[in-house]
């Protein structure tokens, strides 16, 4: 069974048994529930919903199902076709729509797809809204409108160029400074929608572009998650081409990974750190936000600029809520997700790229030189599998009590901040697992801290 239902939408492998995988009836059921939620929030209004997708092989099929279902529910549709996740989010706002559905499984393998659900601000649904959709999906007896109430497709126009124009128009994107540096950039778009937008954005910034996996066929050339073990190809190409840097995006282009001129990883955590350094240089004393599992380096850089750092629960919707609460000038997640409120409240690899290249141009440094200006931390990510009979919440409470004298945050699992390192323990919502994230000044220290807490969990569980 691979159909995973959550407050942000549903995802699963395409085909197989209904209610156990992502099948046509499941797509129809959850799209109908979403349309009902939006109608409930807008009584008596003729709804308009934006639909966009990444380049997955199943994308067009799922998009057709979503579009047809929305029309059957009486909603009008603006279909932006092949579009990035941030682009679809921005289209909702630009087109003044009532919501949006993004068809993408992000960094998951090619057999997966998903529906991500947006509100009228082009942001992910709140926890309460997501739960309402899940509840509505299980209700029976919904009556669809008659033939005169069917919606219409208002347009089928790409939004990618508009997205690029809006990024380049930002006051802190210094197009001329980047053009003067004439960066040579290798870009790996894993044969998804990034292959359409990233080369064009880079060329508009005056870069010489070497394209790698930029044909949007949906046949991912490697594991689509932008982790170091999946990026050996671009590292080799950078060295061979004597490029200044490499840019890697995931299939829906909300995550940005950077590779230095020597083929070494800039490290995803430091995408946000570097962009924040630039934004804070223009907004001294500004606040920042990332999630609890993100690097301490962002806090260090924020405090260097006289600002205040805040942490949210994991998940884009939680980061955005905390950013709005604190008035943060920049934020995001440590997986390369940059959220710049001056454009929109969503992770966006295009704005991340433009702001990063501006900073690199202003600094007059190489990638490795810039990376060396930031505090160096090492992260270890582990998990411990438990039996279904074990009360995971009770285990986490025990850990929290043991370390009550330390700086403990329990808004999302349990995070313990020590003077030189930290550990974050999170339970899975779909399986009996505790994820163990640690960060320290060396890899050996991070690994040792993880093993220490894995040992404590085993002791508590008597395993």
Describe the predicted segments one by one.
Residues 1-68, 72-73, 153-185:
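An N-terminal, well-structured beta->alpha segment
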Residues 13, 113-241:
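Gly/Ser/Thr-enriched, mixed-charge loops and adjacent short helices
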Residues 36, 48-112, 200-259:
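N-terminal small/polar loop signature for handling phosphorylated ligands or for N-terminal nucleophile
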Residues 51-53, 187-189, 260, 342, ...:
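Short glycine-centered, acidic/aromatic-flanked micro-motifs in structured strand/loop junctions
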Residues 117-120, 257-261, 339-341:
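Short beta-strand-to-turn element immediately C-terminal to the catalytic PLP-Schiff-base lysine
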Residues 131-165, 169, 260-334, 339:
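Proline/glycine-rich low-complexity loops and linkers
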Residues 245, 281-463:
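Phosphate-binding and adjacent anionic-ligand microenvironments
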């Amino acid at each position: 069974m691979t159909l995973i239902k959550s407050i942000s939408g549903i995802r699963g492998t395409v085909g197989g048994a209904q209610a156990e995988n992502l099948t046509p009836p499941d797509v129809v059921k959850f799209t109908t529930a979403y349309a009902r939620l939006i109608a409930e929030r807008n009584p008596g209004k003729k709804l308009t919903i934006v639909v966009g997708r990444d380049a997955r092989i199943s994308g067009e099929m799922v998009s057709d199902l979503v579009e047809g279902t929305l029309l059957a529910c009486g909603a009008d549709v603006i279909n932006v076709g092949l579009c990035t996740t941030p682009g679809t989010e921005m289209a909702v706002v630009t087109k003044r729509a009532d919501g949006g559905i993004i068809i993408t499984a992000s960094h998951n393998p090619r057999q997966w797809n998903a529906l991500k659900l947006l509100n009228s601000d082009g942001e992910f649904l709140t926890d309460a809204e997501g739960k309402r959709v899940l509840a509505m999906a299980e209700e029976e007896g919904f009556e669809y409108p008659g033939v005169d109430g069917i919606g219409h497709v208002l347009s089928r126009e790409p939004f990618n160029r508009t997205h690029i124009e809006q990024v380049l128009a930002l006051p802190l994107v210094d197009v001329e400074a980047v053009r003067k540096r004439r960066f040579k950039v290798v870009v790996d778009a894993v044969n998804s929608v990034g292959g359409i937008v990233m080369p064009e954005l880079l060329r508009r910034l005056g870069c010489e572009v070497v394209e790698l996996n930029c044909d949007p066929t949906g046949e991912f050339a490697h594991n689509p998650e932008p982790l170091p073990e999946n990026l050996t190809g671009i590292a080799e190409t950078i060295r061979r081409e004597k490029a200044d840097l490499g840019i890697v995006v995931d299939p829906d282009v909300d995550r940005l990974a950077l590779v230095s001129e020597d083929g070494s990883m800039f490290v995803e955590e430091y995408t946000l750190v570097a962009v924040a350094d630039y934004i804070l240089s223009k907004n001294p004393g500004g606040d920042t936000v990332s999630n609890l599992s993100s690097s301490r380096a962002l806090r260090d850089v924020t405090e260097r600029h006289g600002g205040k750092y805040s942490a949210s629960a994991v998940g884009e919707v939680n980061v955005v809520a905390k950013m709005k609460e604190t008035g943060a000038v920049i934020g995001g997640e440590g997986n390369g997700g940059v959220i710049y409120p001056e454009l929109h409240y969503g992770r966006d690899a295009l704005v991340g790229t433009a702001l990063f290249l501006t900073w690199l141009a202003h600094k007059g440094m190489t990638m490795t030189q810039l990376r060396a200006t930031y505090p160096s931390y090492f992260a270890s990510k582990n998990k411990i599998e438990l039996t279904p009979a074990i009360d995971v919440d009770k285990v986490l409470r025990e850990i929290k009590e043991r370390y009550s004298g330390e700086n403990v945050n329990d808004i999302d699992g349990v995070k313990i901040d020590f003077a030189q390192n930290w550990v974050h323990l999170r339970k899975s919502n779909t399986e009996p697992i505790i994820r163990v994230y640690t960060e320290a000044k060396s890899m050996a220290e991070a690994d040792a801290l993880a093993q220490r807490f894995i040992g404590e969990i085993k002791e508590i569980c008597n395993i």
